[in-house]
């Protein structure tokens, strides 16, 4: 195999280290980064899951339920809209430290598309 085509985890060909470093630096104007788990402004009202969805175990937002939020919170909204946009106000306020995604396309580090590129080849796979 040609050595030039192999991925070298010690070289930063994609420039990800600078992307991450920029995300860790204070913002211009002395503004400090916003808290990562602050709830964002509410999204337009979305219908709650139907009775059929609830019968199949879909009882509100799985993200909030997994994080042991109150039932009144996690049952008040869904995690995602049918088109894939994030509806959860808690997750919408989170900014992924790897890629900077938030709002409609927010996700945690576990679901970040860049995590596969940043993982050390000999590290365990997320407890799996």
UniProtKB/Swiss-Prot annotation:
Q: Where is this motif: C2HC 1?
A: 61-88
**Gene Ontology CC terms, in alphabetical order:** cytoplasm; germ plasm; perinuclear region of cytoplasm
Protein origin, superkingdom: Eukaryota
Repressor in keyword set: yes
Signal peptide span? none
Transmembrane parts of this sequence: none
Tell me the residue numbers annotated for binding Zn(2+) 1. 61, 64, 77, 88
**Which Gene Ontology molecular function entries are recorded, alphabetically?**
RNA binding; translation repressor activity; zinc ion binding
PROSITE patterns this protein is in? ZF_NANOS
InterPro entries in UniProt: Nanos/Xcar2, Nanos_sf, Znf_nanos-typ
A Pfam family this protein belongs to?
Answer: zf-nanos
Q: Where in the cell is it found?
A: Cytoplasm; Cytoplasm, Perinuclear region
Q: List the ranges annotated as motif C2HC 2.
A: 96-112
Kindly indicate whether the keyword RNA-binding belongs to this entry. yes
Sorted keywords for this record are:
Cytoplasm, Metal-binding, Repressor, RNA-binding, Translation regulation, Zinc, Zinc-finger
Start and end residues of each stretch annotated as Disordered: 23-58
Q: Where is this region: Essential for its translational repressor activity?
A: 7-23
Q: What is known of its domains?
A: The Nanos-type zinc finger is composed of two C2HC motifs, each motif binding one molecule of zinc. It is essential for the translation repression activity of the protein.
- Assembly state and interactors? Interacts with ccnb1.
Q: Which family does it belong to?
A: Belongs to the nanos family.
Q: According to its UniProt entry, what is the function of this protein?
A: Acts as a translational repressor. Can mediate repression affecting different steps in the translation process: cap-driven, IRES-driven, polyadenylated RNAs or nonpolyadenylated RNAs. Essential for the development of primordial germ cells (PGCs) by ensuring their proper migration and survival.
Q: What is this protein called?
A: Nanos homolog 1
């Amino acid at each position: 195999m040609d050595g030039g085509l192999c991925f070298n985890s010690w070289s930063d060909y994609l420039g990800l280290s600078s992307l991450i470093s920029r995300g860790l630096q204070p913002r211009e104007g002395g503004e400090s980064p916003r808290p990562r788990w602050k709830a964002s402004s509410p999204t337009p009202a979305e219908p709650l899951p139907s009775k059929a969805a609830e019968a199949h175990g879909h009882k509100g937002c799985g993200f909030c339920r997994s994080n042991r939020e109150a039932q009144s919170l996690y049952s008040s909204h869904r995690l995602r809209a049918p088109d894939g946009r994030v509806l959860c106000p808690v997750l919408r306020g989170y900014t992924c430290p790897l890629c900077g995604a938030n709002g409609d396309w927010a996700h945690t580090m576990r679901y970040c598309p860049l995590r596969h590129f940043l993982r050390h080849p000999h590290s365990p796979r997320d407890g799996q």
